From Swiss-Prot:
Stated family: Belongs to the SOSS-C family.
GO cellular component: nucleoplasm; SOSS complex
Name assigned to this protein: SOSS complex subunit C homolog
Pfam families: SOSSC
PANTHER family, per the entry: SOSS COMPLEX SUBUNIT C (PTHR31526:SF2)
One GO process term, biological-process aspect: DNA repair
InterPro entries referenced in this protein's UniProt entry, alphabetically: SOSSC
Length: 123
């Protein structure tokens, strides 16, 4: 049979669990957790693609970014600098702090034409 836990032991266990949850919550909110993503990556420029400058998320485009969380700002700037598209900051009740806008790329024309099939003559 298991020994009954005293209320002091149960309170101590509950306190430790709550402290651990609070620590994890602070780490997530502060953006301290490093996911190993290199934010200094260079993006290859495609030929024929116009170069666009995306506005800084912290500027408050249309007043949208003024109430954005620091985590959203920290995710917006490196993401917008490492992709081919750009992002539009927005105020959303669903947690979408910015929307991706990706360029529509036209397929490359085929420069190598396949030769027509010729019948084999057996004589």
């Amino acid at each position: 049979m298991a020994f009954p836990t005293t209320s002091a032991q149960q309170a101590d266990t509950t306190r430790k669990i709550l402290e651990e949850i609070q620590t994890k919550k602070q780490l997530l909110a502060g953006g301290i957790i490093n996911l190993g993503i290199n934010t200094q990556m260079s993006t290859p420029q495609l030929l024929g693609q116009p170069t666009t400058v995306t506005p800084d998320f912290q500027l408050g485009v249309g007043g949208v970014a003024a109430n954005a969380t620091p985590t959203a700002r920290a995710a917006f700037n490196p993401t917008s600098s490492t992709t081919l598209g750009f992002f539009v900051p927005q105020d959303s009740y669903f947690g979408n702090s910015f929307l991706p806008v990706l360029p529509r790329l036209e397929p490359l024309p085929s420069s190598i034409a396949t030769p027509p099939a010729t019948p084999i003559n057996n004589k």
